[in-house]
Regions:
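Terminal-tail/helix-coil boundary detector
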Residues: 1-2, 205, 229-265, 280-284, ...
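Conserved, mostly hydrophobic/aromatic
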Residues: 6, 18, 41, 48, ...
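Short, well-ordered coil/turn segments that N-cap beta-strands
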Residues: 11-16, 52-55, 79-83, 119-124, ...
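Glycine/proline-rich, positively charged
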Residues: 27, 33, 94-198
């Protein structure tokens, strides 16, 4: 397994990390992802560790906290210092007026609750799940800085931020000498390349590493969805599609056909090629892969240990290109002084 620095930090993370969205299976939405129990989670974690994948990502809203609880039970008895635990909070976690957001009140409570569920006394990477415009950035970062100094958090990051959200936060950290975000858990895939327009250049400039979520385009790049064919019987898309990233059908089919062609050339599956393409992009520190079962996990792990050729990368780039929104389409006219990162 290859390990990379998480952004500009000294922490090294595996290029593939394991997501626990399938753990617990509470509620219609998360049960459509999976319902992995503790026994099965232990097996999946064993496979991960054998392959060198030692970072496990969760969130307080995954199955209403059950995903963190299952992860905590599944890692019991393992050397804690050999594991990297990543989790998130900010979204609503209860019915109370303060059970949401990035206020001091909510973040302190959310971190303590996560530590209890995970059965640990520190979190390696804690990320805000979204931007809270109702709480001053200074309050949020001062709270996270206190939690880092208290030893409850090792590193901090964000998820699903706009460019200005992240840049303002980094400026506040620098101005006040507060803990700095080193990671941005962002959506990025061959059928969703918007990350490249603003967030990737920011990550390069500011040393913020990407931890990629949904690298297979919300389950669309599994190799099971093809032009002119119905969705697989066990697809989660009928239940979850409205909550995920929009993907035009023609773009999806064009990308899948390119992935199949390249996959045939290198002897790899559609998802393995899609993941390997991501691993060659700037700023990407780790790609979060999930799995309902051992077979899915082993297939995803086959995305490392080899590389697409520059010609194959260019072919996938061409198949996945989309129309840029403003101001990014306008900036294409001044690439002489403002080049694209890829």
């Amino acid at each position: 397994m290859e390990y990379r620095h998480l952004g500009r930090s000294g922490l090294k993370v595996p290029v593939l990390s394991f997501g626990t969205g399938t753990f617990g299976g509470k509620g219609e939405f998360f049960s459509a992802w999976g319902s992995t129990d503790v026994a099965e989670a232990r097996k999946l974690i064993d496979i991960c560790l054998e392959a060198g994948v030692n970072m496990f990502d969760s969130a307080d809203i995954y199955s209403a906290g059950s995903a963190e609880s299952v992860l905590g039970e599944a890692i019991k008895g393992r050397p804690r210092d050999e594991l990297l635990i990543s989790t998130k909070a900010t979204f609503r976690s209860g019915k109370g007026a303060n059970d949401v957001g990035s206020s001091r009140h909510h973040l302190v409570a959310a971190v303590d609750a996560a530590l209890r569920r995970l059965g640990t006394d520190y979190i390696d990477l804690f990320q805000l799940h979204g931007f809270d415009a109702s709480t001053p950035v200074e309050e949020t970062l001062a709270t996270l800085d206190d939690l880092v100094r208290a030893g409850k958090l090792r590193y901090i990051g964000v998820s699903n931020f706009s460019g200005w959200h992240l840049m303002k936060s980094l400026a506040v950290s620098e101005r006040h000498g507060l803990a700095r975000y080193v990671a941005h858990q962002a959506y990025y895939s061959l059928v969703g390349r918007d990350y490249e327009w603003e967030l990737m250049p920011l990550g390069i400039d500011q040393g913020v590493g990407a931890v990629v979520w949904s690298p297979l385009g919300w389950g669309r790049l599994t190799g099971k969805i093809r032009r002119g064919q119905p969705l697989p019987a066990n697809s989660r898309l009928p239940v979850t599609a409205d909550m995920g990233p929009p993907v035009p059908d023609e773009l999806l089919y064009r990308v899948v056909e390119a992935l199949e062609k390249v996959g045939a050339e290198v002897g790899k599956t559609v998802p393995q090629v899609a993941l390997n393409w991501l691993l060659q992009r700037p700023t990407v520190s780790s790609v979060v892969v999930g799995a309902r079962d051992e077979a899915q996990l082993r297939q995803n792990l086959g995305a490392v240990g080899w590389n697409l050729t520059p010609a194959q990368v260019a072919e996938l780039d061409a198949a996945s290109v989309t129309t840029r929104s403003y101001p990014y389409w306008h900036q294409q006219g001044f690439l002489e002084r403002n080049p694209n990162p890829v």
